[in-house]
């Protein structure tokens, strides 16, 4: 409040809103046909490396995301198990001016013109790209 008194608490903050461990989350995601994709591993807070102190060998992730593409060589050197994985660079922007310039992109196939849902088609294509 205006006097800096606590007026309530939030028990399920987004960063800890699950009781699944890493293996269970990976298995569940895979079971539903998704890709478990560690995000912004190079961020100093909440990235898998900051939380665990390492990029684990298991579960076997097919891809990962960097917040800053300039950190790629450093992370490959520190964690050789990242070397042959797909990766994307994403700014994790929450403001328009923080969006990257488009120099990092993923090429996906053109959606068919047969009435297929474009968003469903692109979602599936992106999952396949990250999986392989």
Residue spans for each PLM region:
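Active-site gating loops and adjacent loop-to-helix segments of metal-dependent hydrolytic enzymes
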Residues: 1-10, 54
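Charged catalytic cores and adjacent phosphate/nucleic-acid-binding surfaces used
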Residues: 13-14, 27, 35, 42-132
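Phosphate-interacting basic helix/loop segments used at nucleotide- and nucleic-acid interfaces
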Residues: 18-29
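Acidic, glycine-rich loop-and-strand cores that form catalytic or ligand-binding grooves
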Residues: 32
């Amino acid at each position: 409040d205006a006097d800096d008194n606590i007026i309530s608490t939030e028990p399920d903050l987004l960063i800890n809103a699950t009781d699944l461990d890493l293996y269970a989350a990976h298995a569940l995601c895979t079971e539903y046909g998704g890709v478990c994709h560690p995000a912004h591993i190079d961020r100093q807070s909440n990235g898998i490396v900051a939380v665990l102190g390492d990029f684990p060998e298991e579960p076997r992730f097919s891809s990962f995301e960097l917040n800053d593409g300039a950190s790629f060589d450093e992370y490959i050197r520190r964690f050789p198990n990242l070397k042959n994985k797909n990766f994307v660079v994403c700014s994790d922007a929450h403001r328009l001016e923080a969006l990257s310039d488009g120099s990092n992109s993923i090429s996906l196939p053109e959606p068919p013109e047969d009435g297929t849902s474009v968003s469903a088609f692109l979602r599936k294509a992106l999952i396949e790209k990250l999986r392989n």
